[in-house]
Amino acid sequence: MENNFCKRVSLLTLGLLLTYISVFAQIHLQIFVKDSKQQAVERAEVSVQYGDSIVDFGITAKGVFTATVPSAGIYSIQASCVGYTPVSISKEVTQESKVVLVMTEQSILLDEVSVTAKKIPQTTATGTVYTLSQNAKECGNPFKALSEIPLLRVDISNQTVEMADGESPLILVDGKLFNSGIAPIDPSRIESVELSEVVSARYLQMGVTKILNIRLRKDTPWYSFSELRTRHDFPSRYGLGAGRFEVGKKKFAISGYVGLTYLRHDKTSYEVNESNGSAIKNRNGEVKKRTDNQDGYLLLKWMPNSNDYFSAIFKGLNNDIRNKAHFDGRYITENTNNPFHNNQSETSSDGGMLGSFYYEHSFKDNSILASYAKYNYGFAKSCQVNVEENADNTVPTMVDFDSRRDQYEVSIDYDSGEKKYGNITSGASMEYTMDKDYNYVATPTEELHTKRLNSFAYASYANGIGKLYYMASAGVQLLSISTDADKTTHWRPKVSASLTWQLPHQQVLRASYYLTNRLPETSQLTAYNTSTNPWYRIEGNPYLVPVMIQNIDLKYDKSIGDFMIRVYSSHNRYNKMIESYVRTEDNIQIESYRNNGTYIGTNVGSYISYRAKSFKASFSVEYNWDKYNGQSAKGYVDLNGHVRWDFGKFFLYSTFDWKNKSYTAISHTEYHNPTNAHVQLAWQITKQLYASIAMPYYWGTRSQTNITEMTGYSMKNKIRFKSESLRPWLLVSWTLYKNPKLRIDNKNPDM
């Protein structure tokens, strides 16, 4: 069945592709729109007119629009874009040819001072296209340049990019999957940055809901990039050392990365009050964590000609964990009150290797056909020992398991590019995962097998009418789960749609909807115990089925000078929700998972951002409701903000996040102070040398209390993160670019 399904999808995609290509048998005219510096003008409106009739109209993508004219003749070609002076020429067209239109930026004269017009962000069906300022392009740091975008929260020192709500977007370069390549980009090469807050069914399949697409200028001979970074806590706790490089010519490039991180002397204290029936265990203690992590990759890129691109990536990851804990307390029953001691130890490791191949072909009409294949091998093993001593009674418990994963993925996608009729994309993908789990505590050793299939085919269409933009994407998803106890197959729809209205005076109103499906994780399906608590077991459920997720978003944006204000609301609905529940067997609490009806989550909030040349700040407030099946709605507040002040070669940066509570189906967490309170001072010593010192948590000692309450059992666990609080770190990085304008863009997905 799976082979026939893939064949049908491949034939359908190929048929659509041949149909699109055959339509354009008339004369094609490639229109390049550039500014005075010969950089492409993104999203310029282009029209081709014959006499009094407009024969073609469209918007540039990467500075190019391909027009179709019915026959030879003299045509009037016009281009306009916000912030530029419109341009118009006449051209005699007799065969397929190229036209270059050069637009000049508008200037406003005020008392003999010339002020270049600020480029207004361009609204699309799914998001917004930003053009970076000249200051951002000349800053030399791509993360600092991206921080100019109002809806992004960028940590320049740690090289991370988040949305204002804390979600990490998928990073694309020139529309291609790309996750590890922001650092090598010279910001002077950035033509535009598109932030998509609604994605097509293709990206929903990957679990992505936000995209940051960085479009670059095209050039290329020899170039190189290298970077060394190191960061360490004081006193010693967490540290890292990393190096990356890229070197290449016009048609070939190689890049690589090696990173080492460590964690030492990390102490977290616990105050635990646990009751099971009439028995009570109260204890205080401390967990000491030790980890070592190694990861790296090697990436090869080859462009034999301007229309074909090949890349291959090889990655490796290993993570080792060594934890120890000791608790002292009292064990209380109706007749006894004895001292209680608890010792715990954990030795774990996980990691894997990945190899992937990517190919892309560009057609003459700027449409693209891309294919991708991946193999991933993963492993995880853990041995945990818990010993409880109560008077003369000693109770040891152990968890000892080993997991192996083989995962295969293939995909093919077609993108028509921007055309007069809009943009059409279609494609198909298949991911097959095989997991083996060994439970060494069981006698004989228990071996469990889990297989998951996730196949998908889709088509998307996007266009606009005046200031109204729309996108619709639909597909069908085949989900299969096979365990030792059960096997199920599910056909599910997958849908994404958006409607965006660009109102006068820099106002935008956007409504969006998506429906997607999610397979249960293997850890939720494997039916053996993974807890060392003798009163409380945790095990999976092999009979789970996929969750169906629906989301409705409504956003209103208003820009006023350097300010941007947003008011928003979001509603989520999870059908066949996989949630935790607890049952009692032989006076033991067993936490497992089940598909339990419907979960509903709703939030409303507002966000304000200010972006000036040397000062940037944002603040948001949000109220959330969570409603689990059979329970009443529970609400909580979420606040976050950030500020950055640049002065000379220095900048001061701070972030702040606070919430009062959070909920699951069986427990809730109370937060006693902010979840994040970070401040740092950075210094760009030279163009190559950068240093920063930070206090990752300055609000005292971060703490929270986790509470679980049910009939016959309760646990209250107060946690204090002692080592990660009030502990500064120092980061130093050295970066060297040579001919950075000539870098080949990475288009291989980073998994």
Predicted segment positions?
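Short, acidic, small-residue-rich periplasmic hinge/interaction motif at the N-terminus
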Residues: S47, S80-Y84, K98-N135, E197
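Extracytoplasmic beta-strand/coil segments of soluble accessory domains associated
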Residues: F143-L177
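Short acidic/polar hinge/loop motifs at secondary-structure boundaries
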Residues: E148, K176-R202, G243-F245
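Outer-membrane beta-barrel signature, preferentially recognizing the C-terminal barrel domain
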Residues: Q507, N517-R566, R573, E591-T602, ...
